[in-house]
From Swiss-Prot:
GO CC annotations on file: host cell cytoplasm
Signal peptide boundaries: none
GO MF assignments: single-stranded DNA binding
GO BP terms, alphabetized: chromosome condensation
Free-text function comment from the UniProt entry: Plays an essential role in viral DNA replication. Binds to ssDNA with high affinity and localizes to cytoplasmic factories where nascent viral genomes accumulate. May disrupt loops, hairpins and other secondary structures present on ssDNA to reduce and eliminate pausing of viral DNA polymerase at specific sites during elongation.
Miscellaneous field: This protein is synthesized in the early as well as at the intermediate time of infection.
Location relative to the cell: Host cytoplasm
Protein family according to the UniProt entry: Belongs to the orthopoxvirus OPG079 family.
Presence of keyword Protein transport: no
Subunit structure: Homoomultimer (Potential). Interacts with the small subunit of ribonucleotide reductase. Interacts with host FAM111A; this interaction protomtes OPG079 degradation through autophagy.
Name of the protein: Protein OPG079
InterPro entries, A to Z: Poxvirus_I3_ssDNA-bd
Induction line: Expressed in the early phase of the viral replicative cycle.
Amino acid sequence: MSKVIKKRVETSPRPTASSDSLQTCAGVIEYAKSISKSNAKCIEYVTLNASQYANCSSISIKLTDSLSSQMTSTFIMLEGETKLYKNKSKQDRSDGYFLKIKVTAASPMLYQLLEAVYGNIKHKERIPNSLHSLSVETITEKTFKDESIFINKLNGAMVEYVSAGESSILRSIEGELESLSKRERQLAKAIITPIVFYRSGTETKITFALKKLIIDREVVANVIGLSGDSERVSMTENVEEDLARNLGLVDIDDEYDEDSDKEKPIFNV
């Protein structure tokens, strides 16, 4: 039987935003700024280029000279409540799973990317002709949904299981999808990369691919304790053995049918 270790959960207040404000260009930029712990300049400018798909523009990021000289990547790090879901409507496709991250902290790269993209559209510069008809005043912005970013491009990503005082375990995410989808929501870090700027009418968003997921090796559950406080309960006794055997995981078939949403999602690009 798995050993249970109880830990008090200490949470810090997180920025919140209304659904309406997150659907405006100014609102999503301000929200991304509010969850950034730094305002250090990272991006010099962004260029959107036409692609083979009419609704998509490729994204080219020019970092500042100091970062470029250090061969810094354009990856973006996020932290937040993370859950991998099965996509019931697409089990026979490569995007049979997707990641939902309720972001609580983000690299300044995120807000500067949004700021640069919508600045380009406002000033009609560094964008393809297909975007010249857009106005930042009338755009419905969809990068965030319910303060979360959805990522269904997982191919080639790595997952790193970490535990204090122990060596981490690094694996390809392809072999971990099933077990990860059975985990409870957990605080995790994700390294993502922007793929395209997507437009459907006046709805727009930036889509991302996952490069790496960094998550606690322990399988945990948040429960209400006898005192009424939330407690973080470890569900594993031997993390490495349980990880290998997929023990200590939630048994329910936690699936999410994106087609059941009233609003048709546009994060599958």
